[in-house]
Amino acid sequence: VPNLTGRTTNDGFTAPEDLTEEKVDLHSEEYYKMVQRSLMNLGNTYRIRKVIEKARAGKEVTLAFIGGSITQGAGAVPIHTECYAYKAYQLFQKRFARNNNVRFIKAGVGGTPSELGMIRFDRDVLREGEQPDLVVIEFAVNDEGDETKGDCYESLVRKVLKLPWRPAVVLLFSVFANDWNLQERLQPVGRQYDLPMVSIL
């Protein structure tokens, strides 16, 4: 049995070792600059504005997050309330909600690429007739083994964009150890559809 301590494999891709990082100072100038750089593309904000208007009007709004382990909450303690998805939901609720009218769907499953995301979207997000108003898609790490080289990712994006209630879509490019991701491969999809894109690089 090979020694795999501290390493993960995915379709022949060997992930870099997980290095312990220092705590981030959320009030530092470096952190502020990183956040400023994170918006790769503002895109067409029409659908997002509609979601915000709906929330401010007191109507029920559903935010959905689909992706891999980062969306699931890997590294967050506790996993369900300290993950980026829940933090984004809380911030949206605080800034735009009226009377707890914002709902939350977290469909993150570790190790899954957008190929499975296509199937999981129906099962994990649209279950029981859900109609999310905003969908964040995060597969920038797990799609390394995607033999379609981004076609499944684009198919998932198109699937969400074509839903009859026209949800807003945001593409999130999270990172693995050593600040690695596939945003160079996947960002053309966001540019093609003029979508908001956020990078953690």
What annotation goes with each model-predicted range?
Residues 56-59, 82-201:
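Alpha-helical cap/lid subdomain in secreted, periplasmic
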